Amino acid sequence: MRKRKLGTSDLDISEVGLGCMSLGTEKNKALSILDEAIELGINYLDTADLYDRGRNEEIVGDAIQNRRHDIILATKAGNRWDDGSEGWYWDPSKAYIKEAVKKSLTRLKTDYIDLYQLHGGTIEDNIDETIEAFEELKQEGVIRYYGISSIRPNVIKEYVKKSNIVSIMMQFSLFDRRPEEWLPLLEEHQISVVARGPVAKGLLTEKPLDQASESMKQNGYLSYSFEELTNARKAMEEVAPDLSMTEKSLQYLLAQPAVASVITGASKIEQLRENIQAANARRLTEEEIKALQSHTKQDIYKAHRS
């Protein structure tokens, strides 16, 4: 598995990371997927305190025992469970982040986190206070680096300007090219993109689109109608015909210099192997990249711009 540097950090992360949210709560099944991922060269595991109310972090913590130093461990904070209910609310305060990291460390059974990420964010947050919390955790040695998980332009601009983030996690795929607006700025500041949702809810895999859900057929995906999705997918299948749709989807993202890793989920080992195969496929040519772009939209985020 090829690796890339994460921003200005000294972390070399696998080009495909495992999004642990998809593992579920059946421990033995989840551990078998995690073991296989690590065995096949994935060293980047992405979790969050929100997933399964912390149970996800506990399972990941079990999986990395005796090989912690071989793993780049990323988790997230900022969503606070509402005691006595199944809901949560947003709390990016310094006090909560410093409380949350201690609980994550306990669940993960480790004394440090490689990448600690703010799990969302709004322009109304006290961003200076949030940055201060992350910087203090770095100084304390509790976290090595920090980043954000956000798609909001105004939030991204503030963190690029004010903080030492090394990465931004964003939903990014051939059917959601909105992050491309930000790639030049992030490259200039040596901030990496960690791309999630690379196959757009399965629309960019080998699964026939006629098997899509009724909701997808009626509502489409983002700005695409279902007819547009069908036409675009058919056209893209004819580009680089030696590659599967999954391979093209991941290789398109990995062709972007700002992208350090593509986060893929897997609830079965077969999915995991397919994603790793896609990461290890041949690179796309410039002509193939342009052809794929010609069949898709480059939208921008229209909200949260100021």
From Swiss-Prot:
Family matches, as InterPro entries: AKR (IPR020471), AKR2_Oxidoreductase (IPR053135), NADP_OxRdtase_dom (IPR023210), NADP_OxRdtase_dom_sf (IPR036812)
GO molecular function annotations of the record: oxidoreductase activity
Pfam family for this entry, one: Aldo_ket_red
CDD domains: AKR_AKR11C1
Gene3D superfamilies, A to Z: NADP-dependent oxidoreductase domain
Keywords, ordered alphabetically: NADP, Oxidoreductase
Active site: 51 (proton donor)
EC number: 1.-.-.-
Binding site for NADP(+): 197-207
UniProt similarity note: Belongs to the aldo/keto reductase family. Aldo/keto reductase 2 subfamily.
This protein's name: Uncharacterized oxidoreductase YqkF
Organism placement in taxonomy: Bacteria, Bacillati, Bacillota, Bacilli, Bacillales
Encoding gene per record: yqkF
